[in-house]
Amino acid sequence: MSSGKKAVKVKTPAGKEAELVPEKVWALAPKGRKGVKIGLFKDPETGKYFRHKLPDDYPI
């Protein structure tokens, strides 16, 4: 896991709460607007990837 990223509490597609570190983080914003930050996570149980919104203060 990358050391620069911090774990975020997310809900996995299986419906469980887990503290995971996103594999990739990006901003999703229309031109000239604030937008949101999205993270790509991997479900530790199923191995499937899913996206989840991140807090606004999360470093990219």
Swiss-Prot record:
It holds the Pfam family Cren7. The keyword DNA-binding applies. Methylated at multiple sites, to varying extents. At least one methylation occurs on Lys-16. It is found in: Chromosome; Cytoplasm. One of its GO terms (molecular function) is double-stranded DNA binding. Keywords: Chromosome, Cytoplasm, DNA-binding, Methylation. GO terms for cellular component: chromosome; cytoplasm. Belongs to the Cren7 family. A chromatin protein, binds double-stranded DNA without sequence specificity. Constrains negative DNA supercoils. This is Chromatin protein Cren7. It comes from Saccharolobus shibatae (strain ATCC 51178 / DSM 5389 / JCM 8931 / NBRC 15437 / B12). The lineage of its organism: Archaea, Thermoproteota, Thermoprotei, Sulfolobales, Sulfolobaceae.
